[in-house]
């Protein structure tokens, strides 16, 4: 029963995170401050996203310079799971998404992560416009078994390389010795 309440708590936290998107009218992002721009982009993404995305975790890599061999041997570096999101490209060609993904973490326990993501997009090859690169951030909420599934906010960097609708996207979770310092990547397919 306790696990049930912890999962309900996570759901409530996610709903609170996106309350601005569900409740606000979309206004021009250029006329406001950073927080207003953020909430308006979340709202615009929630209300006007023409794309649906499938997320498939690809790799978890613990930085060998920050972990001892005992921890490396114990940890799972082959996550499996899936996720779903909605996304859009703005007038500048930048990518926005709202998503929820669940995967097996370092301890081989389920970890959900839901949030908003933004990436500045580049198409550096005139001849090959289908190839794109991105850099940005994700802001969301996660919960882990070793933290008793208490919802924890997270703000993480994002980077990607893609071809047409398929994108290899990744983040790096900073940390201390034997904690954090994890490269996590997934494939994202846009429908």
Swiss-Prot record:
GO BP annotations, alphabetical order: lipid A biosynthetic process
Top enzyme class? transferase
Which residues are tagged with the site Role in the phospholipid gating? 177
Q: What is its main location?
A: membrane
The protein's annotated catalytic reaction(s) are: a lipid A + a 1,2-diacyl-sn-glycero-3-phosphocholine = a hepta-acyl lipid A + a 2-acyl-sn-glycero-3-phosphocholine; a lipid IVA + a 1,2-diacyl-sn-glycero-3-phosphocholine = a lipid IVB + a 2-acyl-sn-glycero-3-phosphocholine; a lipid IIA + a 1,2-diacyl-sn-glycero-3-phosphocholine = a lipid IIB + a 2-acyl-sn-glycero-3-phosphocholine
Which UniProt keywords are listed?
A: Acyltransferase, Cell outer membrane, Membrane, Signal, Transferase
Kindly indicate where the leader peptide sits in this chain.
1-23
For this protein, the Enzyme Commission number is 2.3.1.251
The organism sits in which domain of life? Bacteria
Q: Where in the cell is it found?
A: Cell outer membrane
Disulphides: none
Acyltransferase: is it a keyword of this entry?
A: yes
Q: Where, by residue number, is the active site? A: 62, 105-106
Q: What GO MF terms are annotated?
A: acyltransferase activity
Gene Ontology cellular-component terms listed: cell outer membrane
A Pfam family reported for this protein in Swiss-Prot or TrEMBL = PagP
Q: What does this protein do?
A: Transfers a fatty acid residue from the sn-1 position of a phospholipid to the N-linked hydroxyfatty acid chain on the proximal unit of lipid A or its precursors.
Q: Which family does it belong to?
A: Belongs to the lipid A palmitoyltransferase family.
Assembly and partners are described as: Homodimer.
Q: What is this protein called?
A: Lipid A acyltransferase PagP
Source organism of the structure: Sodalis glossinidius (strain morsitans)
Give the taxonomic lineage as stored in the record: Bacteria, Pseudomonadati, Pseudomonadota, Gammaproteobacteria, Enterobacterales
């Amino acid at each position: 029963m306790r696990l049930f309440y912890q999962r309900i708590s996570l759901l409530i936290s996610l709903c609170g995170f996106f309350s601005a998107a569900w409740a606000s009218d979309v206004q021009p992002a250029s006329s406001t401050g950073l927080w207003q721009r953020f909430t308006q982009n979340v709202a615009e993404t929630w209300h006007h996203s023409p794309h649906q995305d499938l997320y498939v975790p690809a790799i978890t890599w613990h930085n060998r310079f920050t972990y001892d061999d005992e921890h490396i041997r114990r940890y799972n570096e082959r996550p499996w799971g899936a996720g779903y999101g909605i996304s859009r490209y703005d007038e500048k060609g930048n990518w926005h998404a709202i998503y929820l993904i669940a995967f097996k973490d370092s301890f081989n326990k389920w970890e959900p992560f839901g949030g908003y993501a933004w990436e500045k997009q580049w198409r550096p090859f005139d001849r090959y416009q289908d190839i794109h690169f991105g850099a940005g951030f994700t802001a969301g909420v996660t919960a882990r078994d070793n933290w008793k599934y208490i919802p924890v906010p997270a703000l993480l960097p994002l980077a990607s390389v893609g071809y047409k609708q398929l994108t290899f996207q990744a983040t790096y979770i900073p940390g201390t010795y034997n904690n954090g310092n994890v490269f996590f990547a997934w494939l994202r397919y846009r429908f």
